[in-house]
């Protein structure tokens, strides 16, 4: 069976090279197109129809042809180049293998800022949030389908009740939401909210239907933290990999700031830590530090899309992040006309720069018809052989080296 290698050249382009050949068979500007081409070049055998577990899935994909012989996908960095090897190392059809543990910060298919993070840990598929709008469900599902071979999300976490974090769970009138498209086994969400919006009420209806009709388990983050009613504070999600629900003071104390109700999650691979705090604001972060013994973190999902009010000094001086991933539409005036505090904001940069310059952002505002385009694109943080690497679907350029940053932001003198 043929094997194709995807190698990034000195121009940042992605070359698809058939094993044994010296010349590239094709060259692409982004990794996703290169991978799709490589997959198409493989011999397709025993094509089958995939039995979609949810009726809503047929709206997006009536039938999916799947490879009879499994496709192995290995992404690594060798000599500064990115490689994608397609090998036969699975027995089940339609599987794109990943590293032992991978975190995917997703683009959301529109110009609006929001969060959706897909995590693959062994055989477990995890989704944290599903922003930014209902139509984002299509982009999320199309991406996750490349990795989730059985149509089941073992864990779904909704951090808080804002549209840019939950609308994709609901979907639209013609795009099925996450709860329609996938079978969700365990749903963890926020204990408190002030929300009464249409999208929140629809989220509750869809969530509860998933429990009633499909047997999902639903727990609040507080139940998880307290190990109550079958919920767990720490879940074993892979060989030596854990997912822990941290205590947030605002799980059981009311606040006027919806963001501070965010569910906070810490992953650990036995060596490295990965922190997700939703849109937790500075007050919530201070409480998080006070009530939890937080470790140094290899990866931190930037609080509240890189806003001026999150990623506070008190949190950063404890977790000392090495890699920071920002889920936002960079430079968008969606929330403000003040350039300095558009996501990712200058105050955020000033605070984070002390610890790392490995900052990545998913999307950027654009004057094109869609009003957005990829900055780094889908950001994938992978663990393989004990090494954590970052590989993005558009490019691997760190934020401070982008044209947007050079025109709109300043790197502080004491920055890395």
What are these regions (language model features)?
Residues 1-12, 44:
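Short N-terminal "domain-start" leader segments
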Residues 28-46:
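A short, charged, amphipathic alpha-helix used as a generic interaction element across diverse proteins
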Residues 51-68:
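N-terminal Sec-pathway targeting helices
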Residues 82-152, 221-296, 371-416:
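Core dinuclear metal-dependent hydrolase active-site scaffold
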Residues 112-113, 134-135, 161-167, 193-197, ...:
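Active-site environment of divalent metal-dependent phosphoester hydrolases
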Residues 122-126, 134-189, 290-307, 320-325:
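Active-site metal-binding motif and surrounding structural segment of the metallo-beta-lactamase
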Residues 163-180, 196-205, 312-316, 340-341:
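Metal-dependent catalytic neighborhoods of phosphoester/phosphodiester hydrolases
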Residues 211, 288, 297-319, 323-369:
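Internal alpha/beta domain cores that form substrate/cofactor-binding pockets in large enzymes
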């Amino acid at each position: 069976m043929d094997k194709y290698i995807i190698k990034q050249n000195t121009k940042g382009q992605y070359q698809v090279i058939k094993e044994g050949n010296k010349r590239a068979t094709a060259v692409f500007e982004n990794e996703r197109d290169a991978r799709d081409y490589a997959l198409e070049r493989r011999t397709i055998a025993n094509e089958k129809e995939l039995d979609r577990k949810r009726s809503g899935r047929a709206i997006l994909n009536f039938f999916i042809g799947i490879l009879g012989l499994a496709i192995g996908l290995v992404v690594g960095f060798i000599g500064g180049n990115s490689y994608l090897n397609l090998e036969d190392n699975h027995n089940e059809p339609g599987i794109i293998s990943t590293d032992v543990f991978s975190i995917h910060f997703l683009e959301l298919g529109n110009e609006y800022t929001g969060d959706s993070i897909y995590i693959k840990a062994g055989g477990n598929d995890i989704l944290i949030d599903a922003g930014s709008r209902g139509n984002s469900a299509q982009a999320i599902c199309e991406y996750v389908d490349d990795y989730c071979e059985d149509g089941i999300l073992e864990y779904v976490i909704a951090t808080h009740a804002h549209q840019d974090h939950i609308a994709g769970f609901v979907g639209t009138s013609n795009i099925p939401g996450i709860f329609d498209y996938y079978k969700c086994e365990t749903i963890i969400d926020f204990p408190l909210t002030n929300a009464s919006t249409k999208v929140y009420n629809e989220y509750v209806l869809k969530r509860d239907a998933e429990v009633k009709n499909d047997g999902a388990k639903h727990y609040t983050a507080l139940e998880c933290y307290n190990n109550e009613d079958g919920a767990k504070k720490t879940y074993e999600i892979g060989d030596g990999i854990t997912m822990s629900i941290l205590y947030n003071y605002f799980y059981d104390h009311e606040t006027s700031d919806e963001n501070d109700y965010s569910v906070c999650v810490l992953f650990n691979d036995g060596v490295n830590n990965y922190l997700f705090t939703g849109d937790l604001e500075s007050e919530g972060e201070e409480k998080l530090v006070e009530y939890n013994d937080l470790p140094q973190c290899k990866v931190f999902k930037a609080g509240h899309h890189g806003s001026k009010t999150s990623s506070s000094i008190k949190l950063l001086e404890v977790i000392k992040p090495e890699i920071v991933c920002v889920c936002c539409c960079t430079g968008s005036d969606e929330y403000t006309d003040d350039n300095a505090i558009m996501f990712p904001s200058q105050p955020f940069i000033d605070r984070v720069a002390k610890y790392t310059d490995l900052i990545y952002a998913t999307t950027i505002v654009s004057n094109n018809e869609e009003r957005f385009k990829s900055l780094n694109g889908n950001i994938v943080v992978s663990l393989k052989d004990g090494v954590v690497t970052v590989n993005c679907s558009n490019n691997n350029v760190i934020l401070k080296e982008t044209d947007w940053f050079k025109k709109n932001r300043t790197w502080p003198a004491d920055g890395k």
